[in-house]
Amino acid sequence: MGLFKVIFTAVAALSAVDAAELLSSAKSKDIIPNSYLVVMKDSVSSAELDSHVSWVTGLHREGIAKRGAENLGGFKHSYKINGWHAYSGSFDSETLASILDNDKVDFVEHDRHVYISGFVTQKDAPSWGLGRVSHRMNGTRDYVYDESAGSGITFYGVDTGIDIHHPDFGGRAVWGINVVNGTKDNDRHGHGTHTAATAAGTKYGLAKKANVVAVKALNDYGAGLWSNIMKALEWCVNDAREKKILGKAVLNLSISGGKVVAANQAITNAAKAGIFVSVAAGNDNQDATNKSPASAENVCCAAATTIRDDKAKFSNYGSVVKLYAPGQGITSATPNNQTGVMSGTSMAAPHIGGVGATLMASKGIAPSAVCAELIKMASGPVLNPGANTTNKLLYNGSGK
């Protein structure tokens, strides 16, 4: 196969792709056999990507005709995000070898599973996160916030779907897209509705006047593929561009999985396009440096605290964490006009997304500057934050 331009998925951090690393080195239970994410070099144009995909499609067909190769599906989807180009597909080893040897290809990774970063604990318990992020000191339930409340900002919830008819959204939620084959345009899991309402619900949310867009990229069990997450990201950027709301958009990823460089690059380019991206650190009580999306650049990564301002026992930590936010025992909306309590860094991330949306609406801050401003405003200290981790706690600057 010549020199392989491939990411070794166990590597903690890569500043450049090592062309000698072997695809076969990647080992993980989350890997999808024969399914790949192919990232093009920075110099490749949109037209060149299209031409390359046509070439790959031809190779795949030739393999079936000449070698009797198994039809694994071939090309699936191309990604064009803010000048970044990639595609996904399922290929046999001979076709993959030709892709790896192509001079327009930067690197190839396995497609992998990714999962939500939250879990249900109980129903109908009292909430505390709203009061906590609007006061420097612990112990109050009152939520104090700027009256703009995210007005004019659009929140993209890339998740299990959203019950857009839930009364907590007050008619501000719309369905965007469903990229998960074999599922309906709804939220049968509940995670997506809960996170969206945490960010932008009328009763349970922080940015109470923000618009909400449902983007279903995880199945009804809370699992998904990075190739679908990337497809959803591309759609969000294009939708925001068409609606002329780049610079006034927030995107939340309450998910976690092993580090995938292609996915990180897609997320980073969505942020660079003009979207504030809040992400979950993950729930493994380990350093999030080797996790995606936590390790992506230009995102605001959230770890989770308890009501006592301790690091939640499950929460990941590490240098990629930008802020802690409430994440244990968080009450929010769930499908079919219900409410529920969930815990996880999944709940912490939309707190950051919601406060970020409010900040963008009230101060006109650019998405690229929001995370730094939130860090500057933060309270704390968080107790026992973990090694090499900030002890700063999300605060909305209410003055209380």
Swiss-Prot record:
Secreted subtilisin-like serine protease with keratinolytic activity that contributes to pathogenicity. It is found in: Secreted. This is Subtilisin-like protease 11. Pfam families: Inhibitor_I9 (PF05922), Peptidase_S8 (PF00082). Glycans are attached at N138, N181, N252, N337, N388, N396. One of its GO terms (biological process) is proteolysis. Residues 127-400 form the Peptidase S8 domain. It is an enzyme of class 3 (hydrolase). The active site is at D159 (charge relay system), H191 (charge relay system), S346 (charge relay system). Residues 1-19 form the signal peptide.
